[in-house]
C-alpha cells in the first residue's frame, strides 16, 4: 500500500523513491512486524487468559509438561496479524506471489484455528479429527499447487488462464519452461523437468509436508519459531536472487519474475517470529498453537516452491524433517511390532525427537538451544548453495 502511495508522491517528494528498493521495504517490513508483535503481545496474552484459552496437555506426554496446562495458546494469531499488516503495508499489491503465499498462510492458519478451537472449547488434546484436518490441508495445497504450476512458469504480467487452457488442450502433456524444473543444489546445470503434473505433485507434498513438519516441531518453548525465522530469512535471500535478472544469471539460478517481492513477506515473518519468541521463550507466556505452526509451515513450503528451492528447504529445515521422520518411524515400528509380537515396541523413548531427549535427561532449554544451533548450521549450508555450485 505504501509503495503505491510513494509512487504517487515520487514526483513531489524525491526521497520517498527509496521505497522502490525491495531491500529497504524488507527492512521496514521486519521492523514493523516486530514492533506490532511486541506492542500487541501483552494485550493478546491478557485477552487469551481472560477468555481461558489455555493449553490442554496430552496425558501421555512428558510429566514435566503438566505444569504448562492452562498456558494461553493460539498465540500464532498474533504472528499472522503482524505478518499480514506489515506485508500489506510494504509489499507490492500487484505481485501475484505475495497474494498466493498470504492466502496459503491464512488458509492453513484457519485449519489450525479450528483445530485449536476444539482443543480449547472441548478440552480435547487431539483437536480436529486427523482425516478432516488432512482433507482441508490437501485441498488448499492442491489449489495452490495448480496455480503455482502456471504462475511460476508464466512471464511477468501474463494472464494464467490461457496457459491453463493450453495445457488442457494439449491433453495434459504441455511441458513447463526450464525455470520450473526441480533444481539440484551444489551442481551448476543439474535439474529435472517435472511437467505440470509432476510440479503439482511435488508442490503439494512440499506445502502440506512442511506445514505438518513445523507443527510437529512445535512442542517445546521456542523450539519451532526460531528455526522458522532462520529458514524464512534464508528463503527471503533466495527470493531476492531468483527475482533479479542480474543476480540469478550470475549465480546460475532460474529467473522467476516477481519472486524478489517475497523478500518483503519473508522479512515480515522474521520480524513477527522474533516478536513472538519474546513471549514464547522459556518459560513460555503463550504458545503458538496449530493456528501459527500450520500457517508458518505452509508459508515456508509455498515460498520454497516459488523460488525453486525445494531441496534446499529440505536441508535448511532439517530440524523439521528429522522431527517428522521420528514420528513416522515410531508409529510405523510400533504398529509393525504390535502385529508381529503382540506388543508394540518403540525406536525412541518418545516422539517427536525433542521428547526423546527430554525423557533422556536433557533440560527443555538444552534441547531447544541445541536444536537452534543445528538449525543455524543447516541454514548456513543451504545459503552456501548460492555460490557453491
From Swiss-Prot:
Pathway: Cell wall biogenesis; peptidoglycan biosynthesis. The chain crosses the membrane at residues 21-41, 71-91, 97-117, 134-154, 167-187, 190-210, 222-242, 259-279, 286-306, 311-331, 366-386. It is found in: Cell inner membrane. Signal peptide: none annotated. Pfam families: Glycos_transf_4. It is an enzyme of class 2 (transferase). One of its GO terms (molecular function) is phospho-N-acetylmuramoyl-pentapeptide-transferase activity. Keywords: Cell cycle, Cell division, Cell inner membrane, Cell membrane, Cell shape, Cell wall biogenesis/degradation, Magnesium, Membrane, Metal-binding, Peptidoglycan synthesis, Transferase, Transmembrane, Transmembrane helix. Its cofactor is Mg(2+). Its EC number is 2.7.8.13. InterPro entries: Glycosyl_transferase_4 (IPR000715), PNAcMuramoyl-5peptid_Trfase (IPR003524), PNAcMuramoyl-5peptid_Trfase_CS (IPR018480). Belongs to the glycosyltransferase 4 family. MraY subfamily. This is Phospho-N-acetylmuramoyl-pentapeptide-transferase. The lineage of its organism: Bacteria, Pseudomonadati, Pseudomonadota, Betaproteobacteria, Burkholderiales.
Amino acid at each position: 500500500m505504501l509503495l503505491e502511495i510513494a509512487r504517487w508522491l515520487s514526483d513531489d517528494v524525491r526521497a520517498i523513491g527509496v521505497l522502490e528498493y525491495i531491500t529497504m521495504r524488507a527492512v521496514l517490513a521486519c521492523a514493523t512486524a516486530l514492533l506490532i508483535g511486541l506492542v500487541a503481545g501483552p494485550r493478546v496474552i491478557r485477552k487469551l487468559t481472560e477468555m481461558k484459552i489455555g493449553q490442554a496437555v496430552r496425558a501421555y506426554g512428558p510429566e514435566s509438561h503438566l505444569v504448562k496446562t492452562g498456558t494461553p495458546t493460539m498465540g500464532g494469531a498474533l504472528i499472522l496479524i503482524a505478518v499480514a499488516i506489515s506485508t500489506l503495508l510494504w509489499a507490492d499489491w500487484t505481485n501475484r506471489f505475495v497474494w498466493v503465499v498470504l492466502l496459503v498462510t491464512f488458509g492453513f492458519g484457519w485449519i489450525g484455528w479450528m483445530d485449536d478451537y476444539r482443543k480449547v472449547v472441548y478440552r480435547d488434546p487431539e483437536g480436529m479429527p486427523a482425516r478432516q484436518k488432512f482433507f482441508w490441508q490437501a485441498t488448499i495445497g492442491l489449489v495452490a499447487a495448480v496455480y503455482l504450476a502456471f504462475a511460476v512458469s508464466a512471464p511477468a504480467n501474463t494472464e494464467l488462464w490461457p496457459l491453463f487452457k493450453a495445457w488442457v488442450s494439449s491433453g495434459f502433456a504441455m511441458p513447463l519452461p526450464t525455470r520450473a524444473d526441480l533444481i539440484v543444489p551444489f551442481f551448476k546445470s543439474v535439474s529435472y523437468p517435472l511437467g505440470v503434473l509432476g510440479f503439482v505433485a511435488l508442490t503439494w507434498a512440499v506445502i502440506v509436508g512442511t506445514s505438518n513438519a513445523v507443527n510437529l516441531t512445535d512442542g517445546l518453548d521456542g523450539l519451532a519459531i526460531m528455526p522458522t525465522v532462520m529458514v524464512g530469512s534464508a528463503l527471503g535471500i533466495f527470493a531476492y536472487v531468483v527475482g533479479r535478472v542480474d543476480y540469478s544469471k550470475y549465480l546460475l539460478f532460474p529467473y522467476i519474475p516477481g519472486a524478489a517481492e517475497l523478500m518483503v513477506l519473508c522479512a515480515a515473518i522474521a520480524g513477527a517470529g522474533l516478536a513472538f519468541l519474546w513471549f514464547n521463550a522459556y518459560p513460555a507466556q503463550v504458545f503458538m498453537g496449530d493456528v501459527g505452526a500450520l500457517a508458518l509451515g505452509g508459508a515456508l513450503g509455498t515460498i520454497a516452491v516459488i523460488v525453486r528451492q525445494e531441496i534446499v528447504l529440505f536441508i535448511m529445515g532439517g530440524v523439521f524433517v528429522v522431527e517428522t521422520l521420528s514420528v513416522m518411524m515410531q508409529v510405523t515400528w510400533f504398529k509393525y511390532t504390535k502385529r508381529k509380537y503382540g506388543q508394540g515396541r518403540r525406536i525412541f523413548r518418545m516422539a517427536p525427537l525433542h521428547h526423546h531427549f527430554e525423557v533422556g535427561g536433557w533440560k527443555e532449554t538444552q534441547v531447544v538451544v541445541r536444536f537452534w544451533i543445528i538449525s543455524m548450521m543447516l541454514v548456513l549450508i543451504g545459503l552456501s548453495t548460492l555460490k557453491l555450485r
